[in-house]
UniProtKB/Swiss-Prot annotation:
It comes from the Eukaryota. The lineage of its organism: Eukaryota, Metazoa, Chordata, Craniata, Vertebrata. Disulfide bonds: none annotated. This is Costars family protein ABRACL. Belongs to the costars family. One of its GO terms (biological process) is regulation of actin filament-based process.
């Protein structure tokens, strides 16, 4: 699977699992994304896909590296629709 395809799948999953925030952007907690069974099956390296999407300014989140448990409450915000 190529990176662009994985990012497009990630965007779909953020839309599926997330909610709109006050700014009208869709966001989801990292822990929700990480724990979702469909995401676990889709993404071999969820954190790597998130980093690639952040570099392309498709999503944003606090920090550089997200770890399960430690960063479960970090919001992943979709910047592009």
């Amino acid at each position: 699977m190529n990176v662009e395809h994985e990012i497009s799948l990630l965007v779909e999953e953020i839309r599926r699992l997330g909610t709109k925030n006050a700014d009208g952007q869709v966001s989801v907690k990292f822990g929700v994304l990480f724990a979702d069974e469909k995401c676990a099956n889709l993404f071999e390296a969820l954190v790597g896909t998130l980093k690639a999407a952040k570099r392309r300014k498709i999503v944003t989140y606090q920090g550089e590296l997200l770890l399960q448990g430690v960063h479960d409450n970090v919001d992943i915000v979709l910047l592009q629709d």
